[in-house]
Amino acid sequence: MTKHDHGLKEKVEGAIDKVKGEVKEVVGKVTDNKKLQAEGKWDKVKGTAKDTVGNVKEKVHEYKEHK
């Protein structure tokens, strides 16, 4: 991704982290692995945070363009 991706990089990374977290959490539940479940929940939180950062960057860029 380029320097001027306007939050796209964070959005993609966030989506990947959320999917990865969901998989870990489900596998952790099926295998009764509490550590894996916790890692999955943490990955989903990280993904949501990255997605939020991406959205903010996008909005800032839009604001600057229409200023």
From Swiss-Prot:
Gene3D superfamilies: YjbJ. InterPro entries: CsbD, UPF0337_stress_rsp, YjbJ_sf. It holds the Pfam family CsbD. PANTHER family: UPF0337 PROTEIN YJBJ (PTHR34977:SF1). Belongs to the UPF0337 (CsbD) family. This is UPF0337 protein BCE_3655.
